[in-house]
Regions:
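Short Pro-Gly-centered flexible turn/kink motifs
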Residues: 138-156
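Hydrophobic residues positioned within well-ordered beta-strands of beta-sheet architectures
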Residues: 6, 23, 78-80, 113, ...
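Active-site/ligand-binding surface loops and adjacent short beta/alpha elements
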Residues: 11-14, 18-95
């Protein structure tokens, strides 16, 4: 058997065009994103929290990424977009089929926003370092195949 994890880490520069500062992440339907907390090393903890309740947007600002990233679990949306609010320009990642979606930017005023659809997770802070011990590791048996892709749409409006 072959154990593995896979995820994408696309990064999008903001501002998309000079003079624009108001951005948001937009779900394709209302969500109450549950996030798994990580420690300072990016490893999973036993804690969870809500990023919001029954929301369709998340403002992109310094406060959103003050404590690093947010790993959302079990979203129902098929798409998550980074939207320049005053022009409608956007980048849309199609996240359907990915059990985890991480959003990240370096601390400070966001200059790059990442929308990361993942099939697996980092390892737990308390636990082994073997792939087979990861809670979301995929395991392929001999003769099986696995295929994935990330569809992204850029809209200049």
């Amino acid at each position: 058997a072959m154990a593995f994890g896979i995820g994408y880490h696309p990064a999008f520069r903001i501002p998309m065009t000079e003079g624009h500062t108001d951005y948001e992440l937009r779900f394709s339907q209302a969500e109450s994103p549950v996030c798994i907390a990580t420690n300072g090393e990016g490893l999973l903890t036993d804690h969870t929290y809500y990023l919001g309740k029954n929301i369709t947007t998340i403002p992109v600002n310094r406060a959103l990424f003050a404590n690093d990233s947010h790993m959302m679990v079990g979203l129902h949306s098929k798409e998550l977009s980074l939207v320049e609010k005053d022009t409608g320009r956007s980048v849309t990642c199609y996240i359907s089929g990915y059990p985890y979606v991480l959003i990240w930017s370096a601390p400070g005023e966001p200059q790059v926003v990442c929308i990361d659809p993942w099939q697996s997770t980092p390892r737990p802070a308390e636990g082994g370092n073997r792939w087979e011990e990861k809670p979301a590791a995929a395991v392929l048996q001999p003769g099986e195949t696995y295929e994935t892709c990330l569809k992204t749409t850029f809209s200049g409006v």
